Amino acid sequence: DQDCLPGWSFYEGHCYKVFNLDKTWEDAEKFCTEQANSGHLVSIDSKKEANFVAELVSQNIKETRRTDFVWIGLRAEDKRQHCSSEWSDGSSINYQNWIEAESKKCLGLEKQTRYRKWVNLNCGQPYRFTCEI
């Protein structure tokens, strides 16, 4: 689609791909940056984009596990566990849809909410992830 690499999906000027690999948040972000110059874990800037990403994840992750989460490019950066004011790609947060704030610092999408709500997760846990370029 529209100048995306093979296997990537186009939406409003960006390309997206769900990876069925288990990585920590940090390793997933690093992996995404290695896919292309502008690659990062997905940043979700609107409800429409959230729906697109949720559908993409649902289509690409068929088998279920006890814990089904998918990393997005958001994590708390300071010691007080508040969320950082930007996505991992540097864009500002102007759309939010998380469940409840906990002490866990990285955010992911949860299968139980059909990948539409954001949940706080332990950054060191390996989960699958979505990259955006």
Curated annotation (Swiss-Prot):
Disulphide-bridged cysteine pairs: C4-C15, C32-C131, C106-C123
Record InterPro entries: C-type_lectin-like (IPR001304), C-type_lectin-like/link_sf (IPR016186), C-type_lectin/snaclec_domain (IPR050111), C-type_lectin_CS (IPR018378), CTDL_fold (IPR016187)
Any one GO cellular component localisation term in the record: extracellular region
PANTHER family the UniProt entry points to: MANNOSE, PHOSPHOLIPASE, LECTIN RECEPTOR RELATED
Location of the protein in the cell: Secreted
Keyword annotations of the record: Disulfide bond, Hemostasis impairing toxin, Secreted, Toxin
Subunit structure, interactors included: Heterodimer; disulfide-linked.
Residue ranges constituting the C-type lectin domain according to the UniProt record: 11-132
Species per Swiss-Prot/TrEMBL record: Macrovipera lebetinus (Levantine viper)
Free-text tissue specificity from the UniProt record: Expressed by the venom gland.
Protein known as: Snaclec A9
Free-text function comment from the UniProt entry: Interferes with one step of hemostasis (modulation of platelet aggregation, or coagulation cascade, for example).
The UniProt record lists the keyword Disulfide bond: yes
Assigned protein family: Belongs to the snaclec family.
Primary location class: secreted
Molecular function terms, GO-annotated: toxin activity
Other facts noted in the record for this chain: Shows greater sequence similarity to the alpha than beta subunits compared to other heterodimer snaclecs.
Lineage of origin: Eukaryota, Metazoa, Chordata, Craniata, Vertebrata
